[in-house]
UniProtKB/Swiss-Prot annotation:
Site, Key residue for binding with integrin: residue positions: M84, Y90, W133
Keyword Disulfide bond appears in the UniProt entry: yes
Disulfide bonds: C27-C38, C55-C152, C127-C144
GO MF terms held by the record: toxin activity
Cellular component GO terms, alphabetical: extracellular region
Signal peptide range in chain numbering: 1-23
Cellular localisation: Secreted
Organism: Echis multisquamatus
Annotated family: Belongs to the snaclec family.
A UniProt-annotated Pfam family: Lectin_C
Function of the molecule: EMS16 is a potent and selective inhibitor of alpha-2/beta-1 (ITGA2/ITGB1) integrin and acts as a potent antagonist of platelet aggregation and cell migration. Binds specifically to the I domain of the alpha-2 subunit, in a metal ion-independent fashion.
The organism's taxonomic lineage, starting at the top: Eukaryota, Metazoa, Chordata, Craniata, Vertebrata
PANTHER family: MANNOSE, PHOSPHOLIPASE, LECTIN RECEPTOR RELATED
Protein name: Snaclec EMS16 subunit alpha
Record's subunit section: Heterodimer of subunits A and B; disulfide-linked.
């Protein structure tokens, strides 16, 4: 009886510890879970607009990835580094400038607020991508028509 209680308690501890890590939801096959979101790294280069279109077609509320914290940025950098075996030096993210009357107006595609930024110093805020030279941590200004791999994201809750 004591062994049963010990094993049951151990399983309960494992379950409770996993439930706080996002293990309480499922992402589709090939997608990776992090902090109640699902992520998919795509190696097939697209321009920014086609990459965004692809992401919106993959899942409800799907978009090019928005990065809301340093921790999420580190996760995305690790995800990208794991699939980048080619020579591409940038990876699209879902941030771009929607200029209005010559004013910079950067916005995330998914409508989330910009609460964390990691722009490379001196960069303007047009279409943004992660750069290979900083292990995919810094955000760089890139011509929106250039072809690069990208990362999709959607909320799993």
């Amino acid at each position: 009886m004591g062994r049963f209680i010990s094993v049951s308690f151990g399983l309960l501890v494992v379950f409770l510890s996993l439930s706080g890590t996002g293990a309480d939801f499922d992402c589709p096959s090939d997608w990776t879970a992090y902090d109640q979101h699902c992520y998919l790294a795509i190696g097939e280069p697209q321009n920014w607009y086609e990459a965004e279109r692809f992401c919106t077609e993959q899942a409800k509320d799907g978009h090019l990835v928005s990065i809301q914290s340093r921790e999420e940025g580190n996760f995305v950098a690790q995800l990208v580094s794991g699939f980048m075996h080619r020579s591409e030096i940038y990876v699209w993210i879902g941030l771009r400038d929607r200029r209005e009357e010559q004013q910079c107006n950067p916005e995330w595609n998914d409508g989330s607020k910009i609460i964390y930024v990691n722009w490379k110093e001196g960069e303007s805020k047009m279409c943004q991508g992660l750069t290979k030279w900083t292990n995919f941590h810094d955000w760089n200004n890139i011509n929106c028509e250039d072809l690069y791999p990208f990362v999709c994201k959607f909320s799993a809750v």
